[in-house]
Amino acid sequence: MKVLHVITGLEVGGAAQQLRLLLRRLPAHCEVVTLTTPGPLAEAIEADGTPVTHLEMTGNRDLSVLPRLSALIRDTAPDVIHTHLYRACVYGRVAARMAGVRAVVATEHSLGDAVIEGRRLTRGVRTLYRATERLGSATVAVSDTVAARLRRWGVPERRIHVVPNGIEAHRFAYDPAARATLRARLGLAPDTFVVGGAGRLVPGKRFDVLVRAVTQLPGVHLLLAGDGPELEPLRRMAGQFGSGDRIHLLGADGGEPGPVPGDGPGVPRMLSAIDVFVSPTPDQAFGLAALEALASGLHVLHGSCPAVDDLPADQAPGARRFGHGVHELTAALRELRRTEPGRLPVPPVVHRYDIDRSARELTAVYEQALAAARRNRPAPEPATLPAGPPGLPPGFSLPDPSPAPAPDGHSLSQR
């Protein structure tokens, strides 16, 4: 089987990292097309043996990418096209139809209740997505929560397949030596209570809530792994609260990047060094960072984590949801500090979300989509789009999602 993956961009992020993990395991010949931003992950994927083509799309409304992508699909002649992220899903489905490929699978990696990929959902975004979704064979949701959101959008049940994200759990196993080494490097005593967080430092992740909560707990330190536009605002916030010496912003990959983003030892070592992990994001599609923390035997406080919330409580006894405010998080951290919970056994939820299992389930979706295409089933119902430029689907245009404000209506710089 030959599979062509089309993704919006390969900048460091959960979707791109997940794609790389899957490419190493899928029993198919795969190639990758990135519409924008190849970055170091493209080099890593190529180093793993998978070709990557960059189409140099200049913006959300760059319609010239459609005939170029369609021509590439004809030249590549894949059995299945698999699209990832909103822009690639919309353009990829249309280009596949233009090229005559009917086995098209799309994964929704970052669909929230009110945002998609960190941007606010609008009526236009929903309408275009729904119209082009009909051109595909299957839509993959990374959690039951995302599947429910797709159903509310009007995606038919028969086209929704839940294939959860997966991790390499062994990479995040607790390492006492790594704990001691990192604490010594940061000047932290063995008995210091240390909180941790990890992710892209952008407003929607709400790491400001985490920083403010820790500043209200004397003697508690925070290790925050990640990079992004909110790095300096968070640093200034810590200083304004007089806690700059207790808020340790480690940078991308926990300050210890490997040759490829996401491959370094920094985040696993950070997880070993802390006592509790916090994921403050209020609207998520899955919750990979929280799952990695559970693989390290940590107690996890989260604002939203469908990977855990969709399952019975006994699957992740160390995970607990908190209200989205600073007060609720501060109280939860204070209680954990008082009880000194210690390390936990790796919970069942971690074994459920194994990346090898994800690859097997995704392969089954490919086989089903390809079998349906080969049986020459009636084409999916046509999308109804207004009139547009010659040679392209009538009036095809991609609405630009509006930037999503922080949930309380203020950016970090306004605090």
Where would I find each of the regions flagged by the language model?
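Aromatic "clamp/platform" in nucleotide-sugar-dependent glycosyltransferases that forms part
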Residues: 282
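Short hydrophobic beta-strand element within catalytic cores of glycosyltransferases
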Residues: 34, 299-303
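Nucleotide-activated donor-binding/catalytic signature segment of Leloir-type glycosyltransferases, i.e.
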Residues: 235-262
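N-terminal strand-loop element at the rim of the active site
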Residues: 5-64, 149, 228-229
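Carbohydrate-associated surface elements
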Residues: 145, 166
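Conserved acidic donor-binding segment of nucleotide-sugar-dependent glycosyltransferases
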Residues: 314-327, 335-340
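A conserved mid-protein helix/loop that constitutes part of the nucleotide-sugar donor-binding site
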Residues: 13-21, 193, 197-216, 220, ...
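Short alpha-helical donor nucleotide-sugar binding micro-motif in glycosyltransferases
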Residues: 73, 252-253, 258-264, 269-274
